From Swiss-Prot:
Activity control: Independent from inorganic phosphate availability, and apparently submitted to catabolite repression, it is positively controlled by cAMP and the cAMP receptor protein.
Alphabetized InterPro entries for the sequence: Acid_Pase_AS, His_Pase_clade-2, His_PPase_superfam, Histidine_acid_phosphatase
Keywords, alphabetical: Hydrolase, Periplasm, Signal
PANTHER family documented for this protein: ACID PHOSPHATASE-RELATED, GLUCOSE-1-PHOSPHATASE
Functional pH dependence: Optimum pH is about 4.
Subcellular location: Periplasm
Organism encoding this protein: Escherichia coli (strain K12)
Subunit and partners: Homodimer.
One GO MF term attached to the UniProt entry: sugar-phosphatase activity
Reactions catalysed: alpha-D-glucose 1-phosphate + H2O = D-glucose + phosphate
Protein name as annotated: Glucose-1-phosphatase
Residues that hold substrate according to the record: R39, R43, R116, E218, H311, D312, S313
Length: 413
C-alpha cells in the first residue's frame, strides 16, 4: 500500500472537517449502539491467464498495481474517507468525542480473513480513529474464509440442494437480460474470443446457465451469467479505480444508459445466487446469528460500535434473510456497492422512554468513488433508509426495538 497517499488522504480530510452540518434527529433521541456490516472497498479484478476475463475477449486487459482480488491503494484511500465521515457522524450523535480515542472495548472491528476485507477494516479504523490502538480481529490463517462471513450451503440433504437450485432458477427467470448480453458481446468482441474460437461458446444470449448448491460450497452458476458478472464487475472496478475512459472497457461504454443495461448482469448474478429466501436464510445464518447476539441477546454488554467487513454476497443474503423491503440506491448502479455499509442504529427516545432501530445503507456514489471525493458531514456519503417487512418504520425511518428483536429472533431459528 502507498502509505504516503494514505497519509495525505488523512491530512486532507482533517482540513475539510470544519463547519460540519448537523443531521436532523427527533428531539430527545440519543444514539446508543451502532453495528455496520460493510462490503470491502475497491479491489483488483481477477484477470489471470485462463480466467473468465481472459477467455471472453481477444482484447488485452489493463494492468493493475496489485494482484487480482486484493484491495487497491485507492480502495484504502476511499475507506479512510468513509471512516472519517462515519466518525464525524458518530461524534455529532455523541457516541465518540472529537479528537479523542474511544475508551477500550467500545469499538470492535471484525473482518473476514482475506487481504481485501482485513485491509478495508484497517483503513476504516485509520480514517475513523487515527492514532488509536484499535485492533482488527480476524482468523489467524489469512486467505481462508471465516465461517461467520462464508456464505456456503450448510444443509447436506439432496432435497435442500434441489430446492435451492430451483429457487435460484426462479430468481433468474424474473430477469430480462437479452439486451445486456447483446451489448456485452459487442463490447468484448465475443465472436473473436478464445471461448468462441477454442470452445465454440460464441453466444452469451443462447448459452445455458447451470446452478449448483453443494454442501459446504457457495451457491454457484456456470454459463453466460457468470461470464457476464465477471466482465461487468471488471469494467465497474476499472471505472472506480480511475482508469482513463478509453481504457474502461476499451472505451466502448459511452453512456449512463449502457452502464445501467450492463449492471443488470452483475446485479442479476447476485440476485439469482444469494437473494432467494431458501438460499439466503441458509447461507446468511452465521452472520445473522452474530448480529442477533450483538444487537439483541447481548446488547447490554456488546461494544457501542461494531464494524464488520465482508462481501457483497454477505450483504445480499443478509438483506433477504431478514426480509428487508426492496430498496433503490441513487447515484449507483450496484445493488451492494463497493465499500457500502448496512448501518444498524439503536436509539433511545427519552421522551417516550422507548428504544428504536433505524437502518441505513451508507455508501459512496459511483462518482465519489471514481473521483476519490473526501467525505464530511458537509460533503456526505449517500444514505438510504431501509425497512424490514417485520418492523415498519415511521416518517423519520425508526421502528420499535421490540419488533426488530422479533425479526432477529425469527431469523436465527
Amino acid at each position: 500500500m502507498n502509505k504516503t497517499l494514505i497519509a495525505a488522504a488523512v491530512a486532507g480530510i482533517v482540513l475539510l472537517a470544519s463547519n460540519a452540518q448537523a443531521q436532523t434527529v427527533p428531539e430527545g433521541y440519543q444514539l446508543q449502539q451502532v453495528l455496520m456490516m460493510s462490503r470491502h472497498n475497491l479491489r483488483a479484478p481477477l484477470a489471470n491467464n485462463g480466467s473468465v476475463l481472459e477467455q471472453s475477449t481477444p482484447n488485452k486487459w489493463p494492468e493493475w498495481d496489485v494482484p487480482g482480488g486484493q484491495l487497491t491503494t485507492k480502495g484504502g484511500v476511499l475507506e479512510v474517507y468513509m471512516g472519517h465521515y462515519m466518525r464525524e457522524w458518530l461524534a455529532e450523535q455523541g457516541m465518540v468525542k472529537s479528537g479523542e480515542c474511544p475508551p477500550p472495548y467500545t469499538v470492535y472491528a471484525y473482518a473476514n480473513s482475506l487481504q481485501r476485507t482485513v485491509a478495508t477494516a484497517q483503513f476504516f479504523i485509520t480514517g475513523a480513529f487515527p492514532g488509536c490502538d484499535i485492533p482488527v480481529h480476524h482468523q489467524e490463517k489469512m486467505g481462508t474464509m471465516d465461517p461467520t462471513f462464508n456464505p456456503v450451503i450448510t444443509d447436506d440433504s439432496a432435497a435442500f440442494s434441489e430446492q435451492a437450485v430451483a429457487a435460484m432458477e426462479k430468481e433468474l427467470s424474473k430477469l430480462q437480460l437479452t439486451d445486456s448480453y447483446q451489448l456485452l458481446e459487442k463490447i468484448v468482441n465475443y465472436k473473436d474470443s478464445p471461448a468462441c474460437k477454442e470452445k465454440q461458446q460464441c453466444s452469451l444470449v443462447d448459452g445455458k446457465n447451470t446452478f449448483s448448491a453443494k454442501y459446504q460450497q457457495e451457491p454457484g452458476v456456470s454459463g453466460p451469467l457468470k461470464v457476464g458478472n465477471s466482465l461487468v464487475d471488471a469494467f465497474t472496478l476499472q471505472y472506480y479505480e480511475g482508469f482513463p475512459m478509453d481504457q474502461v472497457a476499451w472505451g466502448e461504454i459511452k453512456s449512463d444508459q449502457q452502464w445501467k443495461v450492463l449492471s443488470k448482469l452483475k446485479n442479476g448474478y447476485q440476485d439469482s445466487l444469494f437473494t432467494s429466501p431458501e438460499v439466503a436464510r441458509n447461507v446468511a445464518k452465521p452472520l445473522v446469528s452474530y448480529i442477533d447476539k450483538a444487537l439483541v441477546t447481548d446488547r447490554t454488554s456488546a461494544p457501542k460500535i461494531t464494524v464488520l467487513v465482508g462481501h457483497d454476497s454477505n450483504i445480499a443474503s443478509l438483506l433477504t434473510a431478514l426480509d428487508f423491503k426492496p430498496y433503490q440506491l441513487h447515484d449507483q448502479n450496484e445493488r451492494t456497492p463497493i465499500g457500502g455499509k448496512i448501518v444498524f442504529q439503536r436509539w433511545h427516545d427519552s421522551k417516550a422512554n422507548r428504544d428504536l432501530m433505524k437502518i441505513e445503507y451508507v455508501y459512496q456514489s459511483a462518482e465519489q468513488l471514481r473521483n476519490a471525493d473526501a467525505l464530511t458531514l458537509q460533503a456526505p456519503a449517500q444514505r438510504v433508509t431501509l425497512e424490514l417487512s417485520g418492523c415498519p418504520i415511521d416518517a423519520d425511518g425508526f421502528c420499535p426495538m421490540d419488533k426488530f428483536d422479533s425479526v432477529l429472533n425469527e431469523a436465527v431459528k
